[in-house]
From Swiss-Prot:
Aquaporins contain two tandem repeats each containing three membrane-spanning domains and a pore-forming loop with the signature motif Asn-Pro-Ala (NPA). The lineage of its organism: Eukaryota, Viridiplantae, Streptophyta, Embryophyta, Tracheophyta. Belongs to the MIP/aquaporin (TC 1.A.8) family. PIP (TC 1.A.8.11) subfamily. A motif (NPA 1) lies at residues 122-124. SUPFAM superfamilies: Aquaporin-like (SSF81338). One of its GO terms (cellular component) is plasma membrane. GO terms for molecular function: water channel activity. It comes from Zea mays. PANTHER family: AQUAPORIN OR AQUAGLYCEROPORIN RELATED (PTHR45687). Gene3D superfamilies: Glycerol uptake facilitator protein (1.20.1080.10). This is Aquaporin PIP1-6. It holds the Pfam family MIP.
Amino acid sequence: MAGGTLQDRSEEEDVRVGVDRFPERQPIGTAADDLGRDYSEPPAAPLFEASELSSWSFYRAGIAEFVATFLFLYVTVLTVMGVSKSPSKCGTVGIQGIAWAFGGMIFALVYCTAGVSGGHINPAVTFGLLLARKLSLTRAVYYVVMQCLGAVCGAGVVKAFGSALYESAGGGANAVSPGYTKGDGLGAEVVGTFVLVYTVFSATDAKRTARDSHVPALAPLPIGFAVFLVHLATIPITGTGINPARSLGAAIIYDNPHGWHGHWIFWVGPFAGAALAAVYHQVVLRAIPFKSSAHY
């Protein structure tokens, strides 16, 4: 009877879920992919998916991106204006407060929109995920258009509150600061966006989600914190772009030649940084292109 009981137990289905199903320790010399072999990599998204165009969820996601980017520009540009108008920086939140405004808004907005659109709120993030085949080209283009429109509207509302103050504060537009070259600015944007998009890939990694059930709920936190840290580092250099929609919206509403000086940096830099992050995570760390379905 004892032997039969042990046999029955050995044949029982493993009903453990979440982190309890995987061993805590990883033997030296083994790859992380050896853990949790029941995981299957999601299939790559098609470049064009016609069925999306007839789905309400597709348009709803774009609306969510528009509203999120609108709110992002509204709060962050207002914060920049509040700091700029004060004669004494000691009486304002300063650079740290500006960084918290950007990072905090990304944290809140990603949390709110992740279940609807994925919570991109940034063409560079969308571009990186497109390169990783996480979404279709159709959806990526739609997202970028809605993000840019939301950014323009958000900055426009801020300017409507006080045009003179908005103009004197530079409209929150990005520009390379005196003492730095365009190469410095481009490098800062590339590295800053790499940090952000790499964090996005790591925080939303489907394999980690399969292993640790708490990962999706915590994803907005490291993403927002990455934005905060990058702003602390690069506000003195470029005002921190790392988001082409944010840079475009502020430049259009500011409507000043200064806002367009070196504007290409805030598109080329973020897109290059996003591409590097996608390659690093998907090819170097996960080696997805070199795997076959038989390995999962």
